[in-house]
Amino acid sequence: MDHVKLVNDPIDIAHIHQLLADEGCGASSVFVGTTRDNFQGKKVLSLAYEAYDSMALKEMNKICSDLRSKWHDLKHIVIYHRLGTVPVCEASVVIAASSPHRSEALESVSFAIDQLKTRVPIWKKEIYEGDNNGEWKENKESIRPKKSKSGFNYAACPCKVEESHDVPRTLVQIRVNDAELTKRLECFVNRKRDEINSQNVVDFKSSFVSSDKDLSDSCARTQSTIIKQEQSNCHLKVRRVNNRCGPQQMEMRPNYELELNKLMGSRDGQTDPTKEMRKSLPNSRLQAIESYMGLTTDNEENIFSRIKRVENRLLQLESISPEYKHFTKREPSSMEAAPPKKIRKKSYSVQELSAFIQKIKNVSEFI
Amino acid sequence: MNADGPVVNVHVLFFAKSRELANTPRSTVDVPTEITATELLDHLVSKFGLTSIRDNLILAHNESYIDNLSDRILFKEGDELAVIPPLSGG
C-alpha cells in the first residue's frame, strides 16, 4: 500500500514501521531526512517548510507508482513530509519501503528521495543567526526551466548546418574504436618502414649487382641475393651473401692488395699503379724500420707480410737479449743464418777441476 | 499579451520567493484560451513584479508542470496556475 502524507507534527517513526510491516517482507528500508543546524558556516536559527499541497501529494503518488513499476516486489511505500517550522535535528521527511528481499527496498528508497528533491513542490526557508530575512533554499536536483538565459526560441528556428567554419575541408573524420585505430596505425608504420627500406636499397645498392635481380629480399646493408646452386636438384632456396668487398673474397678481387697498398700509401692523387710510383712511395717509414732492424726491404711485398716480418724480428731479438740493439750487425743474412749461441753453463767433475788447477799452477810457474 | 481571442479568468498561486514578491499567496488573472508558455510567463512576471527571479521560474497548469516554454497551453475558465521557484523539499 502507498502511504503518502503531509504532516504538521513530528513524524512518528514507530507508526511508519507499523505501516511497513508485512509477513511476506524480509526487508524494509527507511530514509529519514533531518534538519541541520548549519549551512555554509552560518548557524540556522529556525527553518520552515511550505508546500503546494495538492500538487505535492499528486507528485508523491506519482513517485510511488514509479517505484512500483521499477521494483515489482515492493510491498508498502511510505512518504511523509513535515510542513511548517521544524526544529533543528528533527525529521523533516521520511521515505520507507518494504519488500521480500532487501535490494528492492534499499534501491527504491534511494531513488525516491532523489525524485522527491527534484519534483515535489515543497520549499524550505532558513533563518540564520544575524540575518532577519532568511533565505529560500534551492535543491540542486530541482527541476529548472529549460529555456536559455537569452530567451531565444530555438524551436522556432529552421535547422541549418554551418559547414564553413572551423574544420578545413581537407580533413576527414574517421570514427573507429581503439583496436581498429591501433591496427591502422601499425599498418601505416609498417608500410612506411617497407617504403623506406626499398628506398634505401635503391639509394645504396652497389653498381655491380644486376638491377634486374629480385631485390625484395635485400636491404641496403647485406645486399643478399638468391642464387640457386649450379647442378643442384635441390628445390630449397639458397641464400648467399654476395659481398664483393670483404676480405674473404680476396680471390675475387685480384687487385685487392694493390688497392690496400693504395690506401696505405700516398694520397697525392696519383692513381696509376706503376712500379715507379711504388718506389717513390713514402712507405719510407716502413723502409726505415726494416733497414734499422737489419731486414731486406721489398716494396713489392704485401704490406702486412712486411710488418709481420718486422714483428717477428723484434720478438726474436727480445728473446735473445734485451740490450740487443747495441750489438745489431748490419748483415741480415749472416745474422739470420747464425744467431749467437747461448752460453751454456758447463758442470765440471772433481777430476777435471783438479786437472784445471794443476794446469794453472804449471802456467804460473812459467810466469 | 494580445487579446485577439476569447479570454478566461484563471487562478494563480504563488509560492516561496514569488509569494513574497507578489505579496499574496493567490490571485486571479485573465488569459487567452490559447497562449504560449513564454508569453504567459512574461505576462505574470510583469503583472506581479517577479522580474528578479524570472529565469528560475517554472509554471504548473492544473497541477502539471509546463516543461517547455515553447508549449502552447489551452485554458478553460477556473483553471489553476502556479508559479514555482526552485524546489527545496526533502
Curated annotation (Swiss-Prot), chain B:
Its main location: cytoplasm. The keyword Phosphoprotein applies. The keyword Metal-binding does not apply. The modification Glycyl adenylate is found at residue 90. NCBIfam families: moaD. Belongs to the MoaD family. MOCS2A subfamily. This is Molybdopterin synthase sulfur carrier subunit. It comes from Drosophila simulans (Fruit fly). The gene is Mocs2A.
